[in-house]
Amino acid sequence: MASVWQRLGFYASLLKRQLNGGPDVIKWERRVIPGCTRSIYSATGKWTKEYTLQTRKDVEKWWHQRIKEQASKISEADKSKPKFYVLSMFPYPSGKLHMGHVRVYTISDTIARFQKMRGMQVINPMGWDAFGLPAENAAVERNLHPQSWTQSNIKHMRKQLDRLGLCFSWDREITTCLPDYYKWTQYLFIKLYEAGLAYQKEALVNWDPVDQTVLANEQVDEHGCSWRSGAKVEQKYLRQWFIKTTAYAKAMQDALADLPEWYGIKGMQAHWIGDCVGCHLDFTLKVHGQATGEKLTAYTATPEAIYGTSHVAISPSHRLLHGHSSLKEALRMALVPGKDCLTPVMAVNMLTQQEVPVVILAKADLEGSLDSKIGIPSTSSEDTILAQTLGLAYSEVIETLPDGTERLSSSAEFTGMTRQDAFLALTQKARGKRVGGDVTSDKLKDWLISRQRYWGTPIPIVHCPVCGPTPVPLEDLPVTLPNIASFTGKGGPPLAMASEWVNCSCPRCKGAAKRETDTMDTFVDSAWYYFRYTDPHNPHSPFNTAVADYWMPVDLYIGGKEHAVMHLFYARFFSHFCHDQKMVKHREPFHKLLAQGLIKGQTFRLPSGQYLQREEVDLTGSVPVHAKTKEKLEVTWEKMSKSKHNGVDPEEVVEQYGIDTIRLYILFAAPPEKDILWDVKTDALPGVLRWQQRLWTLTTRFIEARASGKSPQPQLLSNKEKAEARKLWEYKNSVISQVTTHFTEDFSLNSAISQLMGLSNALSQASQSVILHSPEFEDALCALMVMAAPLAPHVTSEIWAGLALVPRKLCAHYTWDASVLLQAWPAVDPEFLQQPEVVQMAVLINNKACGKIPVPQQVARDQDKVHEFVLQSELGVRLLQGRSIKKSFLSPRTALINFLVQD
């Protein structure tokens, strides 16, 4: 037993003294801990009745490190256990946590602690989405290297997370800007390139003509001007890297049907992808009969009718008319604004080898997000009119049989097939030849990942004048970022300035070549990070397949709803791709999603739109006004930000109220998916403060009852007291059932807290005799503390330390020599699950108890049936017959129906 006492520390040593013949009541002696004079039980051996702010601080100071060390000792290596992978979206290391961070990480921490108590093998990892524009801006503005700025911020934010008492799986920490992570981002990019899913084409960028540099959208103000130079931003075509996400559109759209837990988010994903009814096909381009080496990709919703093509149409804004194409002059000479224009450029279908003209359409906007489409008169009246107007030849390729079946004609090997069969066969053939054929929508675009930035993952491609774009050999990864001494924010891509880094040898021919100087969009880094968490230190591959297959999919993914479209789409894309590469067995990465709401602060705004600080506002009148000018202010609730002067510093509120109080406030103030209006004067904060006080008071009453010198003897309870204890037993089981459901199904942690508050209220009303002699009271009190532990780990740890030292306990199924967070989650007693055939339904009339009647179990939850059952009973006939009943209210949980009667 000695190792047990050593592991559990001071309060266990007190218990040992009692078990070894000490007195049968708690000794209220004060132990002096070197360097501290605390007033809490764990430090002094003396229970204090008062639960003050100082007590809360002392409790959290005492338990903070102990809980952290406790969590670090729990092994994650036992693969025989069922697993639970809870993941909160990792933060950008901006340098300071905000309340939104506190909310999402409090939720994930609470769920992780709960699942550990259920006996699950749990990981709750944390890392840093560390590449990105702010670090580069800081380098320009403050003359700091992005690496230094980022690492400093990570160090500070890690300390902040630690001060919040959050127990992450820190041994799994990842940082996307470190070579040991982005090596594998580059590896996955090369796999995409080899699969034909990464390619280059021209695309528009924001161009600053003064600084001669590309700007991110965030660097362009509302007037279309550069953030630094103030110059009017231009749109310019540059050759950019894309990932062909459209190749997985249909698979990802179909897979949504297998995600029943994605409530609210599935619709957003489906809308982003669009209706996958067609595909893109590739064409080579000729002018005046000469091949140009250029390609054009165009969309059709009816690829089965491709042999009936009359033309390929492009919009007036197409890149061929505005970029660096060799066809630009020929196309522009043919352009007549406002008219459909036939051009001398011919498009050769790479699947069918048909040659058709390119037409510039009069209308600027095509369907969806298209800028090119295939004209097929057999399936489009609009295409028929255009072909006839311009005198274009085409074939009718669809025949309708007498029974209404449509079959193909004049369509090579597809002739005679039904349209449905031809659609499948033709798109499959196109995919096999890598000339298109991926079923997608007319609105989804491929993912542009090029960024003309320094602080991002280098794209592992070498440009050779002989071999063309060539991937860096896998054994030569990572391609690390060169050390650039200064950043000006001007000129071309920063990496282009590092000439020693740019100039290299071609991996194939060994001739002179140049590295790609664009870096990847940071969304690429975060599109696969959930895989790396499963095997974060693997030096040989992004992750081990067997390890990833054990932990994946993520059981619960928590993050802001603002990421419910793009980030989730890209993450799903990477997961589908890795599945097809035989890297993982699961296609979808996330089982359940919890998109938490915002934390909003109150704002005060002048009619001019200027936001005021709270100190500038006069709140003494009926409406807020500007303290100086007395102008009326617009008062709103908005997402917290510095510019709106409505932010709250997490460290300040934790210092003021304590960690557990802020945790409980965040979890109790609103359901996780709803916004929280941050106002500590509302009922939520006083409510959770009162609840902590009630938990403390309940424990005090129990300790005092058992320390009174009287032995607990259940047989001394009267029938009335036994009935009271039975009610507590029923209430406890009901709460266990409902709280467990909230933790596992709907994650309504606010409702879980409400249930626990109800149980604590019921326990508060227990008679002194029940407290002393009833095992039901003891069990319900202990179950309450265990269920509250994931929500408020510090105060419940202290309370459990007090409960553990109570002599002559009646409940043997708790592990009294372990802390509350190491207890097994309470289970509903089997007897409670055996529902009785008859429920004793309490009948109230105008809120006054009038008796009980037996009601069959099968109707006890049906409002109308219980209502009628009561009316036909002897009690109902006697008390309700002939009276005007306005309404009745049924409470199935408490077996009570209340009739409101007109007197």
Curated annotation (Swiss-Prot):
SUPFAM superfamilies: Anticodon-binding domain of a subclass of class I aminoacyl-tRNA synthetases, Nucleotidylyl transferase, ValRS/IleRS/LeuRS editing domain. Changing residue 522 to N: In PRLTS4 and HLASA; reduced activity; decreased leucine-tRNA ligase activity. A motif ('HIGH' region) lies at residues 92-102. Disulfide bonds: none annotated. The keyword Acetylation applies. The modification N6-acetyllysine is found at residues 68, 236. One of its GO terms (cellular component) is mitochondrial matrix. It catalyses: tRNA(Leu) + L-leucine + ATP = L-leucyl-tRNA(Leu) + AMP + diphosphate. Pfam families: Anticodon_1, tRNA-synt_1, tRNA-synt_1_2. ATP binds at residue 642. Keywords: Acetylation, Aminoacyl-tRNA synthetase, ATP-binding, Deafness, Disease variant, Ligase, Mitochondrion, Nucleotide-binding, Phosphoprotein, Protein biosynthesis, Transit peptide. GO terms for biological process: leucyl-tRNA aminoacylation; mitochondrial translation; tRNA aminoacylation for protein translation. Belongs to the class-I aminoacyl-tRNA synthetase family. NCBIfam families: leuS_bact. Catalyzes the attachment of leucine to its cognate tRNA. This is Leucine--tRNA ligase, mitochondrial. The lineage of its organism: Eukaryota, Metazoa, Chordata, Craniata, Vertebrata. The gene is LARS2.
